[in-house]
C-alpha cells in the first residue's frame, strides 16, 4: 500500500523584500516519486502520475483514489514484453514510471502511459480510476521503454463526431526499430480494441509516424529527441523538443555532447506527416545564447502586452524557459531565461521557409532524418498560412534559429517550469524553479517584465515541468518529486500598507481604503465609491498635519489634518495617538480635519522613557467601518533631555540653552536673565580646535586653551577647573578664565604608569561651577607622552613624532626633552639639526642567509641606528653591492636591498657591511652572520602525475631550495601556487594544464636564477571523475559511509566530499582505495529550520573536492538526500532502568531507519557499560541484549558521528537462596550424585565391547550438545547480528568475487598467480607461426588423444605434469569448448574402460587425479559453473567463510601454532584456559587523519599483527583484500595524548625472553586499555625491523617447499603461521601456548583416544554456532532449483554421460553410479572450492579458517559417500562432530541425484550451442599462444615417443600428423 499524508496547512516564507507567511495546501507522498500532473478543466479535480501509482485528488488536494500500476515483472530487453511472449532474459520487479498523463475529455477517461512492458498505457475512468483497459498485445501499443519521466509529450486532438487522435512524441533510448519518435494514433472508444493506438494512417510507403533512422544512431549512438511540451493552436499541432546537435557534437574535440532546441509543427489533419517542419528555437540575452528548452506554456497576451507586441489580444503567445548554452541536458545550468514567442512569428518563419523550398532554393536541411542533403524541388504553387504539404519537399528543417523575446533572466534559482494567464489587462506568468521556489512575473511589454514575488514552496527540491491552474485561475498547482502544492495565485493580504500593496507589482492587488487592506477589487465592499479602491500608487491616501510636532510640556494644541484621495467621510472620523488617546475629529468645510493634541497626563504615558524625541502615529479611524484607515507621523519633543549647549540649539525643534543654569528648555522665559539665553550654535560656550594638546610626562607647566563664549561664574558659582582622567584616575586642576575666549589650567605635572606606550590619550575636559562641562569639538585630543618609552636607541628617538620635541641625549644615552639633558647645546641631538645622524649602527639580523650568485635576492637587514633616510646608507653583502629599496626602508630599524650579480666564479661567504653617511669607524658596522652564495638544484618532483585541472600538492626536491628571497615554480606555462619551502623541498599547488593531459617541464626561478632539470617532468593526467555513489543518502549530521566509484582517483591527494545547503558549505574526508574507488564520510548540513522533512532535504550542491577539478564540485545527476537524524528517548523519567541480566533492553527513538531506497542502513553501536550488544533495529526502537554483568551500567548509542547518552541500566540478579534452601539442595544433589555414581560403575562393568563404548560416546556427545545449547544459541545470536550487519552492507557486487580470469587461473594453476597464459608471448615470428600450427594440430582429435595417452604412458610424466597438461589443454581450447567437451568425454570413456580392465573397483574411478582426464574434468566444471557460483552458490559460501572467520576471531588465536579457542578442528584447538578481555580500539583511518575514528573490537591477548589484521578488516570492510593495505606494510601506532605515539610490534626490545623461549608481544604486553586511540601508519623501517625481517625470512625459507605443495595458492600467508620460531637463533617463539606443552598435552590426549570434555564442548559450541551457514551452503549445492537459479546444464549433461557409460558397461549397482557422480562433481569441484574460497573471492584465508573449512569439506565428502557412516572410539572428532547431521545430508545428496536423473535430457545440439556461447564470452581471457608454448615443452621433452605413437596410430598416419608435427619442430628449431 502507498503511504501518503495530507498536510492541509504547511507554512512557507516568500522571498525578496516580503516577509509574511501564508498557509497553502499540500499532498505529500513518501514511498513513491511523483512525475506528472493533470487538472480537470471543469471539475478542478487533480490527477497525479507517479512511480507505480496514479492518484486522484480533490481540488483541495484531499486524496480520493489511488491506483497501483507497479512494480511489474519485466526486463527492458524483452520485446515484445513478457506478457505476450516468453522472454529468455531474467524477469525482475521493475518500477512503472508514469511518463504521460492526459485527460481524454471526449471519452471521460485518463490516459496514463508508463515505462514497463516497453511503454504501454492504461485507460482509467475519471470517476474512480477504475482500469478500463490496458492494450499491450500489438506493437502499436508500445510507445517507448525509455525510463526518463519527462521525455514524452502528448496532445489529444478531438475531431467532432469521429474518434480523437493522440499526437505523441517520445525519446526512444536507441530503440528506433521498435518505437517511432513522433506519431499520430487513434483513440478508440473501446479501450480493449486491437485498433487502439494504431497509426492514423499506414500503408507500405507512408504512415503517420517519424522514426529515427538507424544510420543516424550508427553515426551518433547518443542521438535521441526529448519532447518537452506539446500543444494545439489553430489547425496545427506543435512540439518543443531537445535533440542532439550532431554538427556541434561532431566538431567538439573534448567529446562533449551538445543539444539544440527545436519547434516541430504539423497540420492536425495531416495523416501522412507531409507537413512535418522543425525549426531551431532559442533566445539570446546580452550576447549569451540560451538553447536548452526547459518548459513552455501557451497563453493569450494581456491587452497591454498585446499592444506592446502589436498583435491582436486573441493571438496565441508561447512563454518558454531556456537554460544557458547547449550542454548538460540532464542537469542544465541554473542560468535560465524566460522568453516570449508569438505564434504568428513562428508560423511566418515556417511559411517563408516552405515558400523558399518550393521555389527550389537550398536543401531540405534535416540531416538527422534524411541522412543526406536532399535538394528542394522547384514546384510553383501558392503557399498560404494553412498549407499542409505535399509528397515532395518534406520533411523540412529550418535554416536559422527562431529567436524569442527575452523577458527575465535568472542565474541562481534555475527556472524550470512556466504557466501564464491574463488578469484584467495584464499577463501574469508563474515560474517554478529547481531550488523549490515559485516566481511571479507581471509582463506588460517586451521591456516591461517585473518579478514581483518569490514564494518558497519545497525548498531545495526542484519544481517539475507540470505547472497548472485551477479552472477559475484562483489557484496554481505545483509538482515536485514528493509533493503536490496548491497555492493561491495572489496573497494580497500579506501587504499591510497602501504603498506596499500598490508597489508590489501584483496586478491582482489593490488598496481597499476604508477597510485599510490589500485585496482583489471584488473583495472590497466600497470599491465602487470614488476613491474607495486604489489601484495606482499615486492614488494612495496622502495625509499632512499642521503643526507636525509639539513639546511634551504643551497640551491641547489644535492640529489641522489635510488629506488627498479620500472617500466620503461624512459618517465621521476620529483621531487617535497609538491607541492611548482618541478624540472625535471636526470635519471642516475645506475637507480638512481638526483634532486636539493629547493632554499632559496622556503625554506622560506616550513619551515616558523616550528621551529627547518620540515619534508616534496619528491615526484616522472611520466611524463607518470602525477601521483606522490612514495615519501620519507626529513628533513629541523634550528639550530638557538635551545635556549640552550644542545639542540643544542644534535640535530641529524650538529649544533654548540657559547658559548660566546649564539647562535646555522649550520656554525661553525660563532663563534667569536675558544675556544667559542661547538660541544658536554661535552663542554656545566651546573650546576651540587648535590641534592636539601635547603634554609631556613629569613636566610642571600650565595649559592654555582658546575658547569662545565662556560664561563668567556668577555669585555663588564655582570657578573653572581642568578635569583629567588617566588610567582610571581623575585629577582636578584649578583653571583661570582670562576672558570669554581664553582659559588656563594652572601649573601641574601629569603621569601614566608603564613604558609600554610612548604616548596615551587623556580624557580631558574643562568644567565650571563644579560639573558644568564646556563643549569640546569632536576632533579635540589631549596626548600625554614619554620620550624614552619604546625609544631605546638614537635612531628610534630621532624618528619620534617631531611635535613631541624629543631628542637624543648623547651623554645619557637616553631619549628625552632638551630641558632634561645636561649641556644640550652639544649633548642633545634632534632631527631638526642639520646633519643629525646616529653613530654606532648595529646589525642584529640579516635574512635570507643564502642566495644565488645571479643576484636579485632581496636581503632584509634589521638592527638599530640604521640611518634616518635610505639615501644616507651604503651596503655591501658578501662583498657584492646591494641596492637599497626606499619603499621597504623603515627609518633606523630596517633596510631591504636587492643583490647585484656576483661576478666571481665561486664567491666566498661574507658579512653584510653598512655605512651611515661616511664609513668612519663610528658610522660603520658589519653583521655577525655570513651571507653565502649557493647554486640550487632540482632533483625530482613528487607525485609525478596529477589531474589536468591542477590542484595537486607537489613536493619538488633538491638542494639549497630555501635560498634567495623569492621563488616561482613554473610548470610549462603556469605558475605553481607556492605553499612553503625549506632547504630540501618546495611545496606548491599545481596549476591547470592548458594542453590537457600531457607532460610538462618544471622550472624554478629563485630571484634572478632559473633552475631546471631535463629528468624532472610532471605528467598531467585525465581529471578524476565520479560515476556512482552508494548510498545516495545520509542523515543531517552526516558522517555515514559513502562508497564512491569513479576514474583516476589515485591522482587525487586529499579528496573531500562537499555539500552546500542554503549557502553554507560543509565538507568531510575521503579515503582513496584504488584508482576507481574511495570511501567517504558524508558531510553534515546545517538546517535553517528546526525540523527536517521526513522525505529528506536535498542540498543545493553535492560533489567532491578533487584538487582543482571543477567538474566534480557539483555532481550533475546527484539526487543526494539528507534524512532526519535519529533521536532517542531517555531510559525512563529518572534516566535509570532496572533489568535482569541477559534480558532484552528496548531503546525507543525516531527516524532510526531513514526512508531511503535501497538496502543500505545506518550502522548503530549500542554500548552498555562500554560493551557493545547485539542489536535488532526497527524504525522506532533498538532491541538490545544487556550484558551479563550487574550493577549500574551507562548506555550510549553511536550512529553517524552522533552520540546519545540515554541513561543508566541497573542490572540486578535474582536474590540468592536462603541458607536452609542451599543445605537442602546440596544434600539432595549429593544423594543424587551418589546414586548416579553407583549406576555408572555398574554400567561400566557390564559394557566393555566397542559398540557399547560407541553408544556411550554418542550419548556423551548428545548430552554435551544439549549442555552447550544455550551457549551456542547466544553465540549464534551474536554472530547472526554480525552477519546480518555484514549482509546489510553487501549488495551483489560487494561480495568480492574474483573476475573470471583470476578465478580460473587460481583453480587451473594453484599457487601460480602470474601464469604465462595471462601475458603476451614475446617470441620470434617463426616460433609464433609454429605455435599457431601446433594449435591447429590440437584441434585434431586423433592427435590430441594420441598426445595425451602417450604422455600418460611415460613413467617420468608426474602427477603435477598431468594436472599442468590438463589445464594448458583447456586453456588452449577455451575458444572451442564444444570440441573440448567431446574430447573430455572420450578421455573419460577411455579412463572408465581402463579402470574396468585393470580390475580396480569401479568406485575408485575419478577418486584421485591420476590422469589428464580427471584434471580436465575439474577444469571443465570450473569454466561452466562460474556463473552458478556468482549468482547462487557464492553467497552462502562467502557467508560461511565470514561466519567462520568472525567466530574464530572472537576468541584467542595462537599466532605461532594457529590454534584457536573456537574451532571445528581438534588439531587446531587451544587446550589450555586462556584469560582474555575484549577491547574496543578507536582507529584513525590510514591516509585520512581527519576522518572519523572507527571502533574496532580486538582481544587483549592478540598479537600486534593479529590486531592490525582486525583493524584493517574493519576499516576496509567491503573492500577486496587485494585492494587494501597489508598488515606487514603498516605499523600500529598507539596514541596517548597529543604528542605521545608508540609503535607496537610483535618483537622489539621489550619482548620477554625466559630461558630459550621468546614470547611475542600482545596488546596486553603493552598494557593497551579499552577505548585507546590507535592509528595504522605506513611501515617505518628501522635497523631493528630490518634485522628482524631478515631473520623472519630465513625462518620461512625452511617451510617453502612444504607450502608450495599445499593446495591453497593464497601465498605463504594462507598456510604459514604469522610468525615462525627462529630455531637457528637458539630461541623459540611462543604466543599463547608453548609448542612442547602442546605436544605433551596432545600425546596424552591421543593416548586416551578421547578429547577431554572441556575441549569437546568448545568444538560443539563452534559447530552449533556455524550450523545454519553450513546447512545453507549444503542446501544450495544439493538443490536443483535454488535462489531462482536453475541447475547448470553442465551438471545434468555430465551426470547423464556417466549414466550412459554405466549402461554401456552394464553396471547396475546404484552405489557405483552414485560414487561416480560424487567423485565427478562434489569431490572434484565443490570440495576444492569449499576448502579454498580464495579461488572464488578476493579474500585472505588464515590457517585456523583453513582448518575449519577442511572439516566442513570433509563433512561434505562424507555426505556424498555411500558407505555406512561407522563411528568408533578411534573416529576423528570432526566425524563425531557431524555424526548426527551426515545422514540428513546424505538424504539431500540422494534426492539431488534422483532429481537430476528425472530431468529431461539435454541434446548434444543444445549443449553445443551453450558451449559455443560460453566460448564466445571468454574467448580472449587467456593468451592461447602462451598456453601452446607451455604445452609444446612436453612435445620437446617426449618428442621421440610422441612421433612413434603418431606412426603407430592408423588415423594419425592417414592424416599425416607425424609430418605436420615434424614441420612444427623444424620451424621452432630454425629460430633457436
Curated annotation (Swiss-Prot):
It is a single-pass type I membrane protein. The chain crosses the membrane at residues 1221-1241. CDD domains: IPT_PCSR (cd00603), IPT_plexin_repeat1 (cd01180), IPT_plexin_repeat2 (cd01179), IPT_plexin_repeat3 (cd01181), RasGAP_plexin_A (cd12790), Sema_plexin_A3 (cd11273). Glycans are attached at residues 60, 549, 1163. Residues 1242-1872 are cytoplasmic. It comes from the Eukaryota. Residues 20-489 form the Sema domain. Its main location: membrane. Disulfide bonds join 78-87, 113-121, 267-388, 283-339, 357-376, 492-509, 498-540, 501-518, 512-524, 575-595. It is found in: Cell membrane. GO terms for biological process: axon extension involved in axon guidance; axon guidance; branchiomotor neuron axon guidance; facial nerve structural organization; gonadotrophin-releasing hormone neuronal migration to the hypothalamus; hippocampus development; motor neuron axon guidance; negative chemotaxis. Residues 1240-1294 form a coiled coil. Residues 1-19 form the signal peptide. One of its GO terms (molecular function) is semaphorin receptor activity. Residues 20-1220 are extracellular. GO terms for cellular component: plasma membrane; semaphorin receptor complex. Keywords: Cell membrane, Coiled coil, Disulfide bond, Glycoprotein, Membrane, Phosphoprotein, Receptor, Repeat, Signal, Transmembrane, Transmembrane helix. The keyword tRNA processing does not apply. Belongs to the plexin family. PANTHER family: PLEXIN (PTHR22625), PLEXIN-A3 (PTHR22625:SF32). Coreceptor for SEMA3A and SEMA3F. Necessary for signaling by class 3 semaphorins and subsequent remodeling of the cytoskeleton. Plays a role in axon guidance in the developing nervous system. Regulates the migration of sympathetic neurons, but not of neural crest precursors. Required for normal dendrite spine morphology in pyramidal neurons. May play a role in regulating semaphorin-mediated programmed cell death in the developing nervous system. Class 3 semaphorins bind to a complex composed of a neuropilin and a plexin. This is Plexin-A3. The lineage of its organism: Eukaryota, Metazoa, Chordata, Craniata, Vertebrata. The gene is Plxna3.
